[in-house]
Amino acid sequence: MASIRVADEPAFVLHSIPYKETSLILDVFTRQYGRMALIAKGAKRQHSTLRPVLQRFQPLLVSWSGKSELRTLTKSEWVGGMPSLVGDALLCGFYLNELLVKFLAREDDYEKLYDRYAETINALSNLEFESKGLEEILRQFELSLLQETGYAAALDRCVENNEAPLAQEQYVYQPERGVRPVQVDDPGHWPVLTGKSLLAIAISDFSDPETLSESKQLMRFLLGLHLQDQVLTTRQILIDLKKI
């Protein structure tokens, strides 16, 4: 296999682990190539030019080469323009990164999801100027993640007749099928939503308090289905703090 070289690819660092004495192995989310594993040689050295650049939640341009699954980072440039995440926003950022690591296979491109992630990190970094709250920002990202990875059925159509839900009626989300009217023998853990909320969620509109509340249950349910037994540490912390 020929060695591949990629230059100046937009990326964010999702996670990093030490490698040997002076290097790091990075899990990065790139716009065109999806999740990539890169080794940053010498990045732990005190005077390394990479050390101050490889920060989470900051837009980067990265270059790499190699032919194995673990490529070698050859350059990383900080793009700038985003304030650092702090407080609750920082915890939410770690939650987003954990979701991406759990959901996305390596080297599958998700350009739309990358753009949504960048928009979400920007919103979190400028939270004081945002009209949306933390929950609304997170719900929009979770929905995009489920849609772009193919884990969410259509919310604006009933599976039984392919018609739009009626605003005042109640519906459940049935695993492997999608939205349908509530029945008396439905399992208690299936999320129940009004047609109004389903139609709003389908267009990523979480501005109504009832929709936001019902969407929280739906997103937890859908994420849980596909994460199965995998535990999201940051999500549990946020739940305990009643932030999501």
From Swiss-Prot:
Alphabetical GO biological process terms: DNA recombination; double-strand break repair
Keyword Metal-binding attached: no
One GO cellular component term noted in the UniProt record for this chain: bacterial nucleoid
Pfam families for the chain: RecO_C, RecO_N
Keywords: DNA damage, DNA recombination, DNA repair
InterPro entries named in the record: ARFGAP/RecO, DNA_rep/recomb_RecO_N, NA-bd_OB-fold, RecO, RecO_C
Function: Involved in DNA repair and RecF pathway recombination.
Family that this chain belongs to: Belongs to the RecO family.
Protein name: DNA repair protein RecO
Name of the gene this protein is made from: recO
